[in-house]
A protein has these predicted regions:
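Generic structural detector for well-ordered beta-strands
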Residues: 14-18, 84, 100, 130-132
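Hot-dog-fold acyl-thioester-processing enzymes
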Residues: 1-76
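Mid-chain, well-packed structural core segment of small domains
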Residues: 69-93, 97
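Short, intrinsically disordered/low-complexity patches at protein termini
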Residues: 37-38, 49, 62, 77-78, ...
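HotDog/MaoC-like acyl-thioester-processing domains
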Residues: 2-9, 89-134
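Intrinsic-disorder/low-complexity coil detector
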Residues: 35, 73, 87, 132-133
Length: 134
């Protein structure tokens, strides 16, 4: 766990997550997002993606998991998150999740975090989170 005082601009934390069939199905069940682009290969082959893709918000949830569990860690409060989805993520892809301290807002005790997800060193999702560290 990292407090506001512990965090320095440029500090970062990285973890890797694998997209599996089970994770996609579990997310579809929990979120009730059963869009066939995620679940039906026959349907998905006819789309611009030419196959099934993971839910974008599933991939984004890896950022939330890293922030809430590891960096800054338990007790962190999410204030906001913006996201840009740049490329699709597919079953069996290994997602590298990176969170870096971009800016500290001392008067509020907030941090801006650069949030990035990559597959094979290509950015698939990026954005900025604002958090209150524990």
């Amino acid at each position: 766990m990292y407090s506001f005082e512990d965090l320095k601009v440029g500090n970062s934390f990285i973890e890797k997550r694998k997209i599996s069939e089970k994770i996609i199905k579990s997310f579809a069940y929990a979120s009730r997002d059963r869009n066939p682009i995620h679940l039906d290969e026959k349907f998905a082959k006819k789309t611009i993606f030419k196959g099934r893709i993971a839910h974008g918000i599933l991939v984004a949830s890896f950022i939330s998991s890293l922030i809430g569990n590891k960096f800054p860690g338990p007790g962190t409060i999410y204030v906001s998150q913006n996201l840009i989805f740049k490329k699709p993520v597919r079953i069996n892809d290994i997602v590298t999740v990176k969170v870096s301290v971009k800016k500290k807002i001392k008067r509020k005790g907030w941090c801006e975090l650069l949030t990035t997800c990559l597959v094979k060193n290509k950015i698939v999702l990026e954005g900025i989170a604002v958090v209150v560290p524990p």
